[in-house]
Amino acid sequence: MQVGIVGKPNAGKSTFFSAATLTVVAIANYPFTTIKPNRGISYLRTRCVCRELGVQDQPKNSRCVDGERFIPVELIDCPGLVPGASTGRGLGNQFLDDLRKADALIHIIDASGSTDSEGKPSAAGAHNPVEDIGFLEKELEAWILQILLKDWDKVSRKTGLTSEEAVETMAERLSGLGVKKFQVEDALKLAGLRGKPSEWSREDLGRVVGFLRRAAKPMLIAANKIDLPSSKENVTRIGQNGSLTVPVSAEAELALRRAVEKGLISYRPGDPDFSVNASARLTPEQRAGLEMIRKQVLAPEGATGVQECINSAFFKLLDMIVVYPVEDPERWTDHSGNVLPDAILIRKGSTLKELALRIHTDLGERMLYGVNARNGMRLGDSYVLSSGDIVSVVSAS
């Protein structure tokens, strides 16, 4: 699963991406060795089951800090988007190509209203940031509709083409965007389309695309620059749009992570506050800057919002849960004796069989049954996983 960071120029998109991917929690032996220039690794933060079990864990694919698991996830930094991107304006084509790979989107909005629709600086509060949400949605839908409409008249007028065959055609055309057949079926129902596909108008298909965009590219709004005075009222207006909205100060998060990197403060992404290290020698400017972050961001908002955006994208938009596969269900270890070695993200509603196949194809294909490591109960391959499950898979040798 990958999440795309999107937004117009100067909204703080690059700052958000830099803050989210500046590692302050060391992860040893993580399998990614190279990341493309516009790719980065960030981390989900979730309560680890080690405290509940009263054990000292030894994570391999993630890190546990004071009972909090930090699980690596991949972010895509999409180029800044301006109106007309769907027709190739600006870096539109590159943006849309990157977007194909994203399963969900975090839309960075300049909540202060100090940049116009193309990202050019303006007076604070002069621009309505709600308009930025609408233009991005329209560009995405225009792009999807272009793909769908290619030769549509010819295809839809094909002798005897049924709505069921139209579903197959649409799903195949949009498969590169991550669109699934069931999503097309749902979108057609929501749009109220029945009968002959040849009778569906461009407006009809436009309604279908609107529902498909929400399903295939779910989006949350990061209302950035929350520390600026003109942002407060705008955040309320943005929230009334109906989208999942998180108040954010990407600049504050980046400053805090850089301070950690320099050994000046103790801070974990998502914390409500920081503490200055006893050995740190802060300049008056550094001390004033940190206090400003505390006063204008952390105290009123409870956090910078960056970590909440990452968590919400995966846990709310993509409906992911965390499970802990182990080899020894009695000691909660892998074959090397590491306690709770892996925290794996998987879709809510996934079965034990799907988890086994995810771990290794051979394990899934040879699976006999599973074991609930919390109580020793035997589990069938159709067992539906819950967040926090600790499970062992038994397979034929």
Predicted feature locations:
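C-terminal-of-GTPase-core extension/linker across diverse P-loop GTPases
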Residues: M1-V6, A11, F17, W152-D389, ...
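Conserved G1/Walker A P-loop phosphate-binding module
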Residues: M1-L161, E172-L174, R214, P218
